[in-house]
């Protein structure tokens, strides 16, 4: 008699749009059940994945909701942990299971940020050096340097913590969606830590927005996050930084304007302890 399988502890949640070929390459590399939330692709992604990988749970959306698709994916996961892999990223063999064990050994850890190796050359993503050298005080009950930010494609979250802070929101959307989630996790008492011993591979898709478009989006997200969470003096400082950041910052400010009412409706100022960390990171 075959013993019953233990229930899965982790699910890979992927939000994707019009990256069918990237998915067909990356999906076989995942070592956990996969939930793919498709942001209204027009390249036959849903049908292609269903044919090639019937084991994948595909959630097709009628419109592009940005990073909110990940939150939808978490609701379909049914596991205590979720890894936010992208259509062009995957965990190194065995490392997702190791990361889950780290989470289980550190009950206050709400989010684990893995090391990121980029491309077939396995170049260390510069953000990993920044996370490893985080100026925030290292907490004794966390497995690595404390953080107030992360890269979604290399993050493992405790679902209890992620859902308690509302997941990714429909104000920021994408890109730069990580900051508000990180700040709210910290405000709720959850720890975020960089763990260099586990690795995610990221082979950036060729189907990407131009860097100038992405930088504009990131500044828009910074402004909206500040509107939702920063006290007024810090908010003013972030608006000034955006105005001084050249064309991407100015365009980011302008593109944030239509979402200002929604951001203000969601406004909840962070506690002083978290804002102290924000100021340390901003220098």
PLM feature spans:
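Short, well-formed alpha-helical segments that are part of the catalytic scaffolds
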Residues: 13-32
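A conserved acidic beta->alpha catalytic loop
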Residues: 20, 29, 38-47, 63, ...
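Glycine-rich, basic loop-to-helix element that forms the pyrophosphate-binding segment
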Residues: 60-77, 98
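Short aromatic/hydrophobic "clamp" motif used to bind/position activated sugar donors
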Residues: 82
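Conserved donor NDP-sugar-binding/catalytic core segment of glycosyltransferases
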Residues: 93-126
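Short, flexible, basic/aromatic active-site loop/helix in glycosyltransferases
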Residues: 114, 129-147
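A short, conserved alpha-helix in the catalytic core of glycosyltransferases
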Residues: 149-157, 161-166, 171-198
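Non-catalytic, C-terminal membrane-associated alpha-helical segments of glycosyltransferases
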Residues: 216-221, 231-283
